[in-house]
């Protein structure tokens, strides 16, 4: 298992998830070095009965470039975890590994599921005085053009509806100012496209 600390962090996190989701029918597929995983499982209490360990002796290094991960990643713990989602063996995948590789492998194996969406995004949710705010993209892409910013708005709306249960989320475009002349050309163009597409329910933040 990749990540900065491997199973020594992941397995205690699984144990906490088991406790928090007590009573729910949730099982865990753990991909990585079987011996290391089982050693960690033995130290965190009785959670092994809810876990299935799938051995993989290869990992994607934290400093490995996404393009290299795509060429050499098959058979790694990260690849196998995403492939389990693709084949319906898992409903979702959680990784503390190489973010760029996670995005690249996920896009390759899972594809973008809606027409017109080209890039995945990383979303973060946090509480505010008015409820939960979801922000994306927070790290999957270094640069984004106007069309991709609109895609993030579409994905953010769908995420908020599906995960947080809102019926009509407020959508805002983060910029250096609320005036139409402020910000990079890509941001100004994205704001225009969002308005024309009927997604504008907040304007610029």
Regions from the PLM with identified roles:
Residues 1-2, 58-59, 98-100, 108, ...:
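Short glycine-rich anion-binding loops that position phosphate/pyrophosphate groups of nucleotides
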Residues 4-11, 37, 74-88, 92-106, ...:
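Short glycine/serine/threonine-rich phosphate/pyrophosphate-binding segments
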Residues 4-62:
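N-terminal glycine-rich anion-binding loop in soluble enzyme alpha/beta folds
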Residues 5-11, 21-29, 143-203:
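Glycine-rich phosphate/diphosphate-binding loop of Rossmann-like nucleotide-binding domains
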Residues 23-26, 47-49, 87-91, 98-99, ...:
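Short coil/turn connectors at secondary-structure junctions
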Residues 30-32, 52-54, 95-97, 123-126, ...:
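Short beta-strand segments
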Residues 45-90:
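Phosphate/nucleotide-donor binding subsite
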Residues 103-139, 197-202:
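Short, acidic/small-residue loops that bind anionic groups at enzyme active sites
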């Amino acid at each position: 298992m990749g990540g900065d600390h491997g199973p020594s962090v992941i397995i205690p996190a699984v144990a906490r998830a088991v406790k928090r989701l007590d009573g729910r029918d949730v099982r865990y597929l753990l991909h990585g070095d079987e011996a290391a995983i089982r050693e960690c499982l033995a130290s965190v209490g009785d959670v092994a009965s809810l876990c299935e360990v799938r051995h993989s002796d290869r990992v994607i290094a934290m400093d490995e470039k996404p393009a290299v991960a795509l060429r050499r990643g098959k058979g790694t713990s990260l690849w196998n975890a995403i492939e389990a989602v693709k084949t319906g063996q898992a409903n979702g995948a959680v990784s503390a590994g190489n973010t760029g590789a996670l995005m690249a492998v996920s896009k390759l194996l899972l594809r973008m599921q809606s027409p017109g969406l080209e890039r995945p995004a990383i979303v973060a949710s946090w509480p505010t005085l008015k409820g939960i705010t979801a922000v994306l993209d927070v790290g999957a892409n270094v640069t984004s053009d106007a069309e991709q910013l609109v895609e993030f708005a579409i994905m953010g709306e769908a995420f908020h509806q599906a995960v947080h249960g809102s019926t009509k989320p407020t959508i805002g475009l983060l910029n250096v100012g609320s005036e139409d002349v402020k910000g990079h050309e890509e941001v100004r163009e994205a704001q225009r496209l969002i308005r024309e597409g009927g997604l504008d329910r907040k304007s610029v933040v």
